[in-house]
Amino acid sequence: MADTRELPVFAYIDDVKQLQELRQYLNKHDSVKLDPNGPSETAQNMIEICSTLNVLPSWSQDVDLVLNSISSLIVVVPGEKCEPVVDSFIKNVAPQFYKGTGWASHAGIAVRVLSNLYKGYSNFHTVQEKIFKALVDMCAEARLIGELECNLETLQDRFNTWKTPVEGQREILRAVHRALLVDQRVDQAAKVMTALLGTYTEKDAAAARDDAMECVRTAVVDPKSFSFDHLERLSAVKALKTSDPLMFTALELFISGTLKDYKEFVAKNPKFVTEHLKVDETILLKKIRLLTLMSLAEEKNEISLDELAKQLDILADETLEEFVIDAIQVNAISGKINEMARTLIVSSYQHRRFGTEQWVLLEKRLKVLIANLKQTHNNVHEVNQRIEAL
């Protein structure tokens, strides 16, 4: 039996009477033909009732009351018999039947009920894992994935608790990824997909083609991502060199290419952006221009606006200034425009690649920072000693 302390109570009558009333209510719909009493065994009785819940949203004005009543009965089914009941419930209380966005929708009501059930089965890991999968899918329909605790650390803790096999982890990660994309949380979705690819090794990397393609696609179209070289190190992405050379070439383009390279690629593959990356080309044009600006910033910290306009294929007027402001706002670079000299002064920038050279540079800068802090500390100490000596 589930932990009923984790769930609210929805009815104050005995179980047999509640089952009979549910059957009577559900039989109001023409397509439902339940026996008025049903099987004497509660689990079988509940399975029959749950099998009719797919039509509930199409006619009932009391979806929340019915689902809450049923969930209060599910949790009293003995542990060894509850799994098929839960299976029937989540099969019929699914996104294809419970539609809408937000808490007030049918999907939102289902999210609430599934959340309560999830909490009630903390001691039944197999059942809880099934409910969680259903909950993620329903959150995607209701656009409520932001309300579900599903960051990577939490997911890994759950996988460890449930002892979820690798393929099961991949299935859940894919579902979370889809839900995040639906809710336009592209940056989080990209991280989840990268974690998914991390479950593949060189032995099964070839089987990860679809996941690898989606990982590259999600990362490239994410407006907040500017560094992609870490994807190259994933076995599943490496396998794209042979399984999907064009997608791998696109990844390399966004790792180190420029606007010129991008235009040449699109000219040779005119349908790739819309059919494979599935994104409006204006989004990618802005992205590759930002990446090109970052590459220019790596080469020199003072760039003439005329050169910048030429490299980015933007008129050297207010349009260019607006682009630079956008680049600063998304943290691609930091700097300012010198109107008199007509130059862009770059004070810092994001690295497109972060390899050995960048780590060495970071180490040098940290050493300088530490040395400066030590010197400052010594100076303050000397000043304090002089004050005390007065």
Curated annotation (Swiss-Prot):
Pfam hit, one: PCI
Chief location of this protein within or outside the cell: cytoplasm
Keyword annotations: Cytoplasm, Developmental protein, Differentiation, Initiation factor, Oogenesis, Protein biosynthesis, Signalosome
PCI domain boundaries: 188-351
Annotated localization: Cytoplasm
GO molecular function: translation initiation factor activity
InterPro entries: COPS7/eIF3m, eIF3m, PCI_dom
GO cellular component term of the entry, any: eukaryotic 43S preinitiation complex
One record GO biological process: cytoplasmic translational initiation
Function of the protein: Component of the eukaryotic translation initiation factor 3 (eIF-3) complex, which is involved in protein synthesis of a specialized repertoire of mRNAs and, together with other initiation factors, stimulates binding of mRNA and methionyl-tRNAi to the 40S ribosome. The eIF-3 complex specifically targets and initiates translation of a subset of mRNAs involved in cell proliferation (Potential). Component of the COP9 signalosome complex (CSN), a complex involved in various cellular and developmental processes.
Summary of subunit composition and partner proteins: Component of the eukaryotic translation initiation factor 3 (eIF-3) complex. Within the eIF-3 complex, interacts directly with eif-3.F. Component of the CSN complex, composed of csn-1, csn-2, csn-3, csn-4, csn-5, csn-6 and csn-7. Within the CSN complex, interacts directly with csn-1 and csn-4.
Family matches, as HAMAP family: eIF3m (MF_03012)
Similarity section: Belongs to the eIF-3 subunit M family.
Annotated protein name in UniProt: COP9/Signalosome and eIF3 complex-shared subunit 1
Lineage of source species: Eukaryota, Metazoa, Ecdysozoa, Nematoda, Chromadorea
Gene: cif-1
